[in-house]
């Protein structure tokens, strides 16, 4: 409700944000999207990949691009890192931290900030959504809401007939 979506991209981001990893960032996203809070400039590489999401890592692809661009980690290894975080493979995670931090420091980022960013990536990547899934769910959600708003009787008839064999669900 606080997001006040004005375009499909807002619904796409909402789908990705409502996950355990990035969920804590919803208030900041909404505030920045609606112009109540300025988007902070962190580093040109991070800013480039998070511009469309108001300075917040929302999609797995953004995280991979940041790991690649800032940490000088090849994209295939960035993908492997994202998957390792999701599966809690600490050996892979721990092997990539110094690579990422060193790459970020070489690109002008403070070492402490680079470590904090890696920690944020760890928190996000375990639950983050990729953009293509968010797009699919957002389009389906939008179409469903539109049908329910403009053709409520037909929508409810279709919803009931899809659950025809589940009388418990039809009663609620």
Language model features with spans:
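Noncatalytic, beta-rich nucleic-acid-contacting surfaces in large DNA/RNA-processing enzymes
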Residues: 1-172
């Amino acid at each position: 409700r606080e997001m006040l979506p004005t375009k499909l991209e807002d619904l796409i981001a909402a789908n990705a944000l409502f996950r355990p990893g990035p969920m804590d960032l919803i208030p900041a996203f909404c505030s920045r999207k609606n112009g109540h809070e300025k988007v902070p400039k962190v580093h040109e590489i991070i800013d480039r990949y998070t511009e469309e999401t108001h300075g917040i890592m929302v999609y797995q692809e953004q995280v991979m691009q940041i790991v690649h661009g800032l940490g000088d980690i090849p994209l295939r290894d960035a993908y492997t890192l994202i998957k390792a975080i999701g599966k809690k493979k600490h050996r892979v995670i721990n092997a990539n931290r110094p690579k990422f931090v060193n790459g970020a420091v070489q690109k002008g980022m403070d070492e402490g900030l680079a470590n904090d960013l890696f920690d944020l990536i760890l928190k996000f990547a375990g639950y983050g959504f990729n953009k293509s899934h968010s797009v699919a769910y957002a389009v389906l959600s939008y179409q469903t809401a539109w049908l329910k708003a403009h053709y409520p009787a037909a929508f409810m008839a279709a919803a009931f007939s899809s659950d025809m064999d589940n009388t418990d669900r039809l009663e609620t």
